[in-house]
Amino acid sequence: MKNTAIEKLSYTEVTKNISQAEYDQTQEEYILSKSPDKYMISLPVKVLMFEGAEDSSPFTYYFYMENDEDLYLMQRKRNGSVVDKTKIPLTKEQGQKILDGDYQFLLDSDEPLLNSLYFQFTVNQLHPLYKKECTRKIFHQNRFLDEIVDIHIVRTPFEEDKDFFATHDKMLKGGTKN
């Protein structure tokens, strides 16, 4: 099997919770802004969180999909409000292979993170825990700073609906709101 180069992105973010009043104020500020550098976009987002047999791992793993199209395998490590993330693009076919328990392509990859994930799935018994769907609002301030807020969050245990790749509208019909 021929291995291809994988485009991997690693970054750090600072997180905090905001109140409804802070969110409303930020949204109004962007709606009224005349600056072309300041804008706001909304994306439908789906996340599938994985859990292992041992909770001692400093990392969290999950699928992340925007617009029902772009799928990423994410590795996250949190230290207080600072979050380090690494994201690797996957095809939906590769994502479905993981959900079906076919992990061989992870081991065959040239990407060390995918190789280590093979062992997380096989040895640490990493498995899907729950799906989270939301609308992600991105408030772009400048080329160095975005404020990101998730709204209309719906969480569903994976066992209740195993079709992670269903379209966004279908997925929002079930689950519990947060």
Question: Model regions: which residues?
Answer:
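Phosphate-end processing signature that detects enzymes handling 5′-triphosphorylated RNA
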Residues: M1-N178
